[in-house]
Amino acid sequence: MLLHIPGLFDADELARIREALERADWADGKVTAGYQSAKAKHNLQLPEGHALAKEIGTALIDRLWKTPRFMSAALPHKVFPPLINCYRDGGNFGFHIDNALRQPKGSPERVRTDLSSTLFLSDPESYDGGELVIQDTYGVQQIKLAAGDMVLYPGTSLHKVNPVTRGQRYAAFFWTQSLVRDDSQRALLFEMDNAIQQLTADVPDHPSLLQLTGTYHNLLRRWAEV
């Protein structure tokens, strides 16, 4: 399941973020890649724990926790702190699958990467290339969103970032460990939750709503890991 979550940051916020990123000291993106992924990764990244990355990441996670669409789709349990990257001068990341487990720097806790997320920080007109290409059950999806928009997709997906041939592409990315690890089960719960919300708006007093809501929670109880 791929999910587009728009408008997490406004234009003024994004302009300030990009201005700060232009002044930042960047490191080789291979630092946080696994052995196989490092062979395909050609980009820049703010070092893990960088103050600016923490500031952007904290604001992003705080907003997502207040975004019902994200909460319903991801059912988040743990989140790996967001990282910030930059693609320019032909920078790219070849096809790869993200590592199954991630351990935040300085933390003993590990995060299972059930879901991957990319928040676009650059206006799409400001750079050429840089599409996030995801292979899923419906074929190949090419994603290049407006600045401030985010895409959520299964961590099991084979994906790449096309070379950036003009300008620079800033983005935040992170992983979520869901309460429900199976993507098909999460998708079913998301569809049920959407149906419940729509029925609540259309026929709020319908007696079947109580039964449907109960079924949702019973399925969540069966599948959730806490």
Curated annotation (Swiss-Prot):
Binding locations of 2-oxoglutarate: R169
Keyword Metal-binding recorded: yes
Full protein name: PKHD-type hydroxylase PP_0862
Annotated organism of origin: Pseudomonas putida (strain ATCC 47054 / DSM 6125 / CFBP 8728 / NCIMB 11950 / KT2440)
Sites where the protein binds Fe cation: H96, D98, H159
GO molecular function, one term: iron ion binding
Database matches in Pfam families: 2OG-FeII_Oxy_3 (PF13640), PKHD_C (PF18331)
Domain Fe2OG dioxygenase: 78-178
Keywords of the record: Dioxygenase, Iron, Metal-binding, Oxidoreductase, Vitamin C
Names of the cofactor(s): Fe(2+); L-ascorbate
